[in-house]
């Protein structure tokens, strides 16, 4: 194995991982994909490069060390969260610490690069390439995603009706006890409490708007697409009940957000950065703000955007396409996504950089505090007691096979 790609959320990252995998395999590399923390027997040989979706600090390195008998020397952090509020920046969230700071860091734009440099990360570890997710919004991928007809048949969505989409991001509204404790420790109890209150009130009012809308407009289909983290929260049951109560309300978490953005007539967001995909696809997206979000907690390019704060405006924007102006100014988005709108594929530029990192010794780093054998003995003893030395489940995942097939077909036929 030359390269080990680790992903967290299936819907957000797996297509990206397979796209990189098959491009690298075309170039002659052996690539393996897995989720973090998947129980497996440590491999004897370490890969030439480990690619991470995030890299916070020492605890991530500990998880990586127990996977290999021999030392790994190179890590690339894809940084799947790069646009965040000042609150998260102030606590250094998603900024690598300890020895993780020595990893290569992929930046979507120069704004993120400056933030990391200000945090003390060396410029020679930073590369500005762009967000790979933007590739899927380019014309070459027009046949990559599910068609409206496919979604209509699978989810009983009348094709002749107009479809409204809400891209939810209420992962902080009803966190688990362990998540709440982690948030309290990370951003402080006062900030945690205030952000939780804003999230709960906003979600409650937006759901009231949506329920009133589907009740008043039975020929409009409304799709609630949750954030992956919301599938674990207590509001899950409430959304399921709404799905059962109204024939035109659909609580659907299957498929990527791009599948839904492409096929819906009206799109709504609260604070999701997926609004950037709407921008690239030239789809107008409404920003719903029944409760004011303090600038300290808000996504930077949402602050000066056009917001909807009352039900009547929400209703009008989901029944009429008269307003076709995007709510966020181009320059606000461009500050964080340097390559937005460019025709060149970002995944190919990422693979070009990966080859540079693999082939240059200057990117070698020591990520160990102890020897790898000691770390792996601890791992094996712990897992034997837990009974967790299980077969890697990735190879048996239906969705993984679908992603793999789609990406393989695209990479091997593109430009052929």
How should each PLM-predicted stretch be described?
Residues 36, 225-276, 280-281:
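Donor nucleotide-activated moiety binding/catalytic core segment of transferases
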Residues 4-141, 145, 230-231, 275:
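Active-site and donor-binding regions of nucleotide-sugar-utilizing enzymes
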Residues 1, 27-32, 217-222:
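A generic structural motif
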Residues 100-105, 221, 264-266:
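Short active-site oxyanion
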Residues 142-238:
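Conserved catalytic-core segment of nucleotide-activated headgroup transferases in glycan assembly
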Residues 103, 126, 247-250, 305:
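Short, conserved active-site loop motifs that form the nucleotide-linked donor/cofactor pocket
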Residues 317-416:
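C-terminal amphipathic helix plus adjacent low-complexity
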Residues 239-240, 273-341:
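Catalytic binding pocket for nucleotide-activated donors in carbohydrate/polymer assembly enzymes
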């Amino acid at each position: 194995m030359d390269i080990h790609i680790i992903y967290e959320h299936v819907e957000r990252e797996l297509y990206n991982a397979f796209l990189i995998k098959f491009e690298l395999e075309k170039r002659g590399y052996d690539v393996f994909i897995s989720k973090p923390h998947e129980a497996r027997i440590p491999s004897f040989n370490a890969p030439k490069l480990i690619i991470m979706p995030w890299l916070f600090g020492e605890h991530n390195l500990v998880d990586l060390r127990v996977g290999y008998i021999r030392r790994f020397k190179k890590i690339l952090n894809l940084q799947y969260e790069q646009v965040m509020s000042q609150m998260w920046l102030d606590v250094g969230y998603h900024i690598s610490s300890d020895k993780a700071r020595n990893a290569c860091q992929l930046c979507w734009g120069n704004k993120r690069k400056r933030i990391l440099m200000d945090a003390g990360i060396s410029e020679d570890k930073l590369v500005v390439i762009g967000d790979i997710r933007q590739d899927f919004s380019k014309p070459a991928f027009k046949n990559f995603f599910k068609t409206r007809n496919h979604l209509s048949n699978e989810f009983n969505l009348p094709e002749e009706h107009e479809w409204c989409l809400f891209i939810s991001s209420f992962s902080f509204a009803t966190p688990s006890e362990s998540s709440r404790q982690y948030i309290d420790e990370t951003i402080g109890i006062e900030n945690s409490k205030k952000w939780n209150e804003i999230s709960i009130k906003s979600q409650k009012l937006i759901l009231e708007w949506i329920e009133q809308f589907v009740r008043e407009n039975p020929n409009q289909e409304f799709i609630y697409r949750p954030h992956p983290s919301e599938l674990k929260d207590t509001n899950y049951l409430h959304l399921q009940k709404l799905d059962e109560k109204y024939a035109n309300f659909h609580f659907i978490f299957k498929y990527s957000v791009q599948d839904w953005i492409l096929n819906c007539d009206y799109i709504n967001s609260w604070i999701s950065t997926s609004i950037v995909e709407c921008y690239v696809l030239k789809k107008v997206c409404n920003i719903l703000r029944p409760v004011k979000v303090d600038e300290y907690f808000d996504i930077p390019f949402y602050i000066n955007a056009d917001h909807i704060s009352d039900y009547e405006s929400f209703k009008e924007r989901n029944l009429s396409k008269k307003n076709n102006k995007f709510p966020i100014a181009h320059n606000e988005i461009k500050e964080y996504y340097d390559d937005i709108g460019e025709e060149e594929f970002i995944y190919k530029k990422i693979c070009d950089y990966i080859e540079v990192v693999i082939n240059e010794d200057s990117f070698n780093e020591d990520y160990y505090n102890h020897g790898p054998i000691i770390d792996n003995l601890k791992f094996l003893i712990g897992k034997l007691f837990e009974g967790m030395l299980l077969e890697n489940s990735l190879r048996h995942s239906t969705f993984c096979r679908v992603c793999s097939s789609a990406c393989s077909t695209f990479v091997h036929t593109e430009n052929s």
